[in-house]
């Protein structure tokens, strides 16, 4: 019993047994049919999630994950010429891969995320990235969302973890104790690119060429729901995903409604 996770996994194979094996029975109940979640929460989910994720989490649908990973990305809808708001507070997603090490710089205003800059440094380490961020943004308040592996990982000499280095530079660091599922990160980004209602709350300034190229070109490995990392498009996407998933996670802690069926 649980939410479907695409076609390429054991739960789909077990579910199909109910259609072909007389010793098995398979049942499908949507969240609405289960009457455990209020209609208001369902409507809120439509605002928070993209169509495929909503179908998976609320409509008990096995969704095909193949081809373009960030399928909700549109050059017409998600790319803007410039950001005109206040950039006093910067939110930066950080991927610790050393070749290249990538940072995605954003502003968040009323749940709208705009990518305004990108940093990509080859053969680098955490100290160098921190120095570059400090040099570029001397007057802004900076919040960094790194890969949770920063709690143990060391990309610089000196014995300090990446998390300790970030804090030593004076950054406000926010990361979970454990890394979120890759698919949850992807679904969170797709949901910001466009929700069920067709509304976009994630935009990219057109000067961020590497972010745009990465989000547009990363695909799944053929016949799987495993993101391809051989092309090098994963680093910027991972950096963005850590930030988005931390602030806008895919919620599954539904609040049950009071049952009135037997009253």
Task: Name each model feature, range by range.
Residues 25-27, 92, 145:
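Hydrophobic/aromatic beta-strand patches that form the interior of the parallel beta-sheet core
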């Amino acid at each position: 019993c649980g939410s479907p996770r695409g076609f390429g996994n054991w739960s789909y194979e077990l579910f199909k047994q109910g259609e072909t094996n007389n010793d098995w029975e398979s049942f499908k109940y949507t969240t609405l049919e289960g009457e455990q979640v209020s209609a208001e929460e369902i409507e809120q989910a439509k605002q928070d999630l993209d169509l495929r994720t909503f179908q998976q989490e609320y409509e008990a649908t096995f969704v095909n994950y193949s081809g373009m990973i960030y399928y909700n990305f549109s050059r017409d809808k998600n790319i803007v010429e410039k950001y005109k708001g206040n950039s006093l507070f910067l939110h930066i997603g950080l991927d610790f891969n050393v070749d290249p090490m990538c940072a995605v710089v954003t502003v968040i205003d009323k749940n709208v995320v705009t990518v305004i800059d990108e940093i990509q440094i080859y053969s680098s380490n955490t100290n160098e990235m921190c120095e570059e961020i400090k040099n570029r943004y001397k007057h802004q308040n900076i919040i960094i969302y790194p890969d949770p592996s920063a709690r143990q990982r060391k990309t610089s000499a000196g014995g300090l973890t990446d998390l300790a280095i970030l804090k030593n530079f004076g950054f406000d660091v926010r990361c979970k104790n454990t890394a979120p599922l890759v698919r949850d990160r992807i679904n969170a980004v797709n949901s910001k690119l466009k929700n069920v209602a067709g509304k976009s709350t994630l935009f990219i300034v057109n000067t961020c060429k590497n972010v745009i190229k990465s989000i547009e070109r990363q695909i799944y490995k053929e016949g799987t729901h495993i993101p391809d990392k051989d092309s090098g498009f994963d680093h910027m996407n991972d950096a963005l995903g850590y930030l988005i998933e931390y602030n806008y996670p895919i919620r599954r802690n539904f609040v049950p409604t009071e049952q009135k069926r037997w009253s």
